[in-house]
Amino acid sequence: MDKANGAYKTALKAASAVAPAEKFPVFQATFDKNLKEGLSGPDAVGFAKKLDAFIQTSYLSTKAAEPKEKFDLFVLSLTEVLRFMAGAVKAPPASKFPAKPAPKVAAYTPAAPAGAAPKATTDEQKLIEKINVGFKAAVAAAAGVPAASKYKTFVATFGAASNKAFAEALSTEPKGAAVASSKAVLTSKLDAAYKLAYKSAEGATPEAKYDAYVATLSEALRIIAGTLEVHGVKPAAEEVKAIPAGELQVIDKVDAAFKVAATAANAAPANDKFTVFEAAFNDAIKASTGGAYQSYKFIPALEAAVKQSYAATVATAPAVKYTVFETALKKAITAMSQAQKAAKPAAAVTGTATSAVGAATGAATAAAGGYKV
């Protein structure tokens, strides 16, 4: 990481001296040259090639109308990636990077008395709570219309609320084409995730399909909220009146894993909470799904969503922070949509796997503290 950090700073300096249209080519060439100097062995060379490919992909995927804006957003993204990698391998402190050091994750808030939900304090918590308020409003709106209109009513209400939440989150950024592009990308990706969730939902009637869809979104929001220590998202079973048996079994397994992880995280020191949450969540998912673990394609995506939502909390630039967060939420929704496809095979599995975490889950319900389980 020392080598990558040095190459990064040299490339950034070289790019600052050229015209906007030349910044990325100069940056890439300089970074590549400096990174490869002195490297030896297949592992080191392989790492350099992968990092170079990542840089190219990252730049191409950055949305901005002007070359300078595009390059600036690219640098922000790369800065956060390098800082994250540096932390992972105990490389030099983040303060050695050109951008401001990432703020520490907010201190853990002890569990509130029963019936009271602690206020959101971080930007991510405020964002997910706004989305959650929109979710509840959408559920309420859909409850008052005929079955055939429930999905359409829900989407109209929830889509507007979540899009507004992201727009407000990005409103503090400097105005410009890059910001407008960021908003458009965030909302369009989430809209696509919502549609995928509904398409994947199974139900014999429009109402049953709608209930399965809402359960998917509920659990996705709950997992992300738990990662960020947000307290207001109810379990899927409390959000809808009926969930098809197959879907409920899979969602119950994810929810059981969440409860175990929440309990473990609450008992850990503040600086270790996410590490403990992640490890416990992964282990509990394996335990609750038993021998079917390897065949559940949704599990890696769900685990990735948990990691990515946490990564958003240590990003400094809003454009990076909310893009990372949006990706996490999309992954969680997609994962739970894939879980629905696993519901039918899961229904044939005995209850033995689920009972593997049953005792821990029972204790977790009472002891999960700040997480509202």
UniProtKB/Swiss-Prot annotation:
Q: Which InterPro entries match?
A: Poa_pIX/Phl_pVI, Pollen_allergen/Os
The signal peptide here is 1-28
Q: In which tissues is it expressed?
A: Pollen.
Give the protein family.
Answer: Belongs to the Poa p IX/Phl p VI allergen family.
The protein depicted here goes by the name: Pollen allergen KBG 31
Further facts? Its C-terminus might be membrane-associated.
Work out whether the entry's keyword set contains Nucleotide-binding: no
Q: Name one Pfam family in it.
A: Pollen_allerg_2
Organism of provenance: Poa pratensis (Kentucky bluegrass)
Q: State the taxonomy lineage.
A: Eukaryota, Viridiplantae, Streptophyta, Embryophyta, Tracheophyta
Q: Which UniProt keywords apply?
A: Allergen, Signal
